[in-house]
Amino acid sequence: MERKQLLSSRELDVILHRLACQLIENHLDFSDTVIIGIQPRGVLLAQRLVKMLEEEYGAMGIQYGTLDITFFRDDFRRGEKPLTANTTDIPFLVEDKKVVFIDDVLYTGRSIRAALTALQSFGRPNKVELLVLIDRRFSRDLPIQPDYIGKAVDAINKERVVVYWKEQDTEDTVYLIEKV
C-alpha cells in the first residue's frame, strides 16, 4: 500500500488557523451561528477549530454540536456488516441560525446530503455552510461545494485521502493512500 503525505503537522496547523480566521471574518461573534461536526471524522476537526476560535481568537459562546449521519446515507445498506451509529449531540435550536457543517474530506457529496437531511429533524436554519479540510474536487456525485476549503486535492478514485489527528491517531497529518 503506497502512501504520500499531503500535509504535515505544521502545514495542517497553518491551514486550521486560516480556516479559523475565515470563520471569524464571516461570522464575527458567532451569536447567530452554530458549528456542527459531522460524525465521525469531522468532529475532531470541529473540536479543534472551536477550541482555536475560543482560545486563540477570543470567540465566546460558540454553540457546537455533533451530527451522526449513519442512517441518513443512501448507501448504508450496502455493507456486509451492521453499522454502528455515533452520537448526535445538538443541544441548541438551529431554527433561523447559520449552520456551519464541518467535515474532514469532501469526496462524492453523499455525506453532506445525508447531513442536510438529518439536520431537518432539528429545525430550519437560515443558512448552511460547509467547511472541509480536504476537497476532492473532481469526484463529486452531487452538486455540493464547500464554502471553506483547507486544501483542494486532485486524486483518482483508486486513491483515498486519510486525515490523522493526534487526539486519535498519534499525529496530525494527511496522506493520499492507494487502495488495494
Name every feature range the model reports, one short phrase each:
Residues 1-32:
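Active-site-facing substrate-recognition patch
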Residues 117-180:
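PRPP-dependent phosphoribosyltransferase catalytic core
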Residues 59-98:
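Short, glycine/charge-rich flexible loops or terminal/linker lids adjacent to PRPP-binding catalytic cores
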Residues 90-120:
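Internal catalytic-core helix/loop-beta-alpha segment
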